[in-house]
């Protein structure tokens, strides 16, 4: 800690998923803007995706090299585009990087470490170097509180049964892998120094933040949605094409369709989404992720020709924040990853929830509970069907029945704008106090 000006240095270690790298990077930018020296540590492949977006001299990108193998070469040291069967090997490789990270911490000697739910060794290694560590929770308080409640109060009813009713659920013994993940998750809360940072805001899930604070016996400090500035860097040709297309559409008449950076739709799912968009008659931009080697014959034959200029299909990555922040965008067909929900709320765009797995169904339910989204209902076989997709798109974007949802999304966005960056300011105050307390103990 710089004694002359109170400037602190902070190291950040996110998990290797884009949905974690992105909020950690946005947090790093906010801390750097407030006169902190920041070190963001991750694998070279993850850092390469943000190098061009880093304009602050106060953020240093620090490479963490994982052990490589023929099955897990360096370009797979990220969950972005990672084949599902390599997810566990990647986690295992990350778990073995503790000694390497220990050397990095020894060299950097930061005043504080901000860590993620994985790897499990981060707070212990920080402690071995006499560095305080704070957990940064990048998922919703609502979904996180369910797991922590079940662990702390087994057999007891969850306090908000309208959101999650566990009264008729008989828990099954978790597998060894899931048990380890659960214990690692609990340890993240227990090892955090005094507070827990959370990517959230009270206007969306205040009661769940309070519940999680009680369950963890730690002060939860929201840092807001941490959405990247959509105008923060130069536009590439693809972005330019998309924005030009949006500029020609009327206000709030376009749905953006995106299912995240890690999930590939099956051919059947692609067809249902495509026909759903077609019969909805609503304008759309669809970011389609295609598995390498399977690029032909996936979208229904003639689909692109039939929708014509009403739809824009973009292969691979799309500038999500730029699209959601555009005045023509009036709905977001989303997999309901927490970062996507936060971005949608930041820009006042209602969510059409097509959740996939993990915490996503709960995130979609939360958006619906608050009144800023609507869930697409699965059929009796657990599948999304074209008619249901089209119906919810039209309700949310076009029909009079969706006006309440559209208004609530706008109102929530306005509240967040009025609040500005108060959450980050308070979070930094808490972090400085932790560093001062540690220094006084030495």
From Swiss-Prot:
Component of the dammarane-type triterpene saponins (e.g. PPD-type ginsenosides or panaxosides) biosynthetic pathway. Glycosyltransferase that catalyzes the conversion of ginsenoside Rh2 to ginsenoside Rg3. Triggers the biosynthesis of ginsenoside Rd from ginsenoside F2. Induction: Induced by methyl jasmonate (MeJA) in roots and leaves. Induced by A.niger mycelium-derived elicitor, thus improving ginsenosides production in adventitious roots culture. The gene is UGT29. Pathway: Secondary metabolite biosynthesis; terpenoid biosynthesis. GO terms for biological process: response to molecule of fungal origin; saponin biosynthetic process; terpene biosynthetic process; terpenoid biosynthetic process. UDP-alpha-D-glucose binds at residues 138, 318, 320, 335, 338, 340, 343, 359-360. Expressed at higher levels in roots than in leaves. It catalyses: (20S)-ginsenoside F2 + UDP-alpha-D-glucose = (20S)-ginsenoside Rd + UDP + H(+); (20S)-ginsenoside Rh2 + UDP-alpha-D-glucose = (20S)-ginsenoside Rg3 + UDP + H(+). An anthocyanidin binds at residue 20. This is UDP-glucosyltransferase 29. It comes from Panax ginseng (Korean ginseng). It comes from the Eukaryota. It holds the Pfam family UDPGT. One of its GO terms (molecular function) is UDP-glycosyltransferase activity. Keywords: Glycosyltransferase, Isoprene biosynthesis, Transferase. The active site is at 20 (proton acceptor), 116 (charge relay). Its EC number is 2.4.1.365. Belongs to the UDP-glycosyltransferase family.
């Amino acid at each position: 800690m710089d004694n002359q000006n109170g400037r602190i240095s902070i190291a950040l270690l996110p998990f290797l998923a884009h949905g974690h790298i992105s909020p950690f990077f946005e947090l790093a930018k906010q801390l750097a803007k407030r006169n902190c020296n920041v070190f963001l540590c991750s694998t070279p492949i993850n850092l390469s995706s943000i190098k061009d977006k880093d304009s602050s001299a106060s953020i240093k990108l620090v490479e963490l090299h994982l052990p490589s193998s023929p099955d897990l070469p360096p370009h797979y040291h990220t969950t972005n585009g990672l084949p599902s069967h390599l997810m566990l090997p990647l986690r295992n490789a990350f778990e073995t990087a503790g000694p390497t990270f220990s050397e990095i911490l020894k060299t950097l000697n930061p005043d504080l470490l901000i860590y993620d739910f994985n790897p499990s060794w981060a707070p212990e290694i920080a402690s071995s170097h006499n560095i305080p560590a704070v957990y940064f929770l990048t998922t919703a308080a609502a979904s996180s509180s369910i797991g922590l409640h079940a662990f702390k109060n087994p057999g007891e009813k969850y306090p908000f049964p309208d959101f999650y009713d566990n009264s008729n659920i008989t828990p099954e013994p978790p597998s060894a892998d899931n048990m380890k993940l659960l214990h690692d998750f609990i340890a993240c809360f227990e090892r955090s120094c005094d507070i827990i940072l959370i990517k959230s805001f009270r206007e969306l899930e205040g009661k769940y933040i309070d519940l999680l604070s009680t369950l963890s016996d730690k002060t939860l400090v929201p840092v807001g949605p941490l959405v990247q500035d959509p105008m923060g860097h130069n536009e590439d040709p693809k972005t330019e094409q998309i924005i030009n297309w949006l500029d020609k559409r009327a206000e709030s008449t376009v749905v953006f369709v995106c299912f995240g950076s890690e999930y590939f739709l099956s051919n059947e799912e692609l067809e249902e989404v495509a026909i759903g968009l077609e019969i909805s008659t609503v304008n759309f931009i669809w970011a389609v992720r295609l598995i390498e080697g399977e690029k032909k014959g996936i979208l229904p034959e003639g689909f692109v020709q039939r929708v014509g200029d009403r739809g824009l299909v973009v292969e691979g990555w799309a500038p999500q924040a730029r699209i959601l922040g555009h005045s023509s965008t009036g709905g977001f067909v989303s997999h309901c990853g927490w970062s996507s929900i936060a971005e949608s709320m930041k820009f006042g765009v209602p969510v059409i929830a097509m959740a996939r797995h993990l915490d996503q169904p709960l995130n979609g339910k939360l958006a619906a509970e608050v009144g800023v989204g609507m869930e697409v209902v699965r059929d009796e076989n657990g599948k999304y069907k074209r008619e249901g997709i089209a119906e919810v798109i039209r309700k949310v974007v076009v029909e009079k029945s969706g006006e309440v949802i559209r208004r609530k999304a706008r109102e929530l966005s306005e509240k967040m704008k009025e609040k500005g960056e108060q959450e980050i300011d308070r979070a930094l105050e808490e972090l400085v106090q932790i560093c001062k307390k540690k220094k006084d103990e030495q």
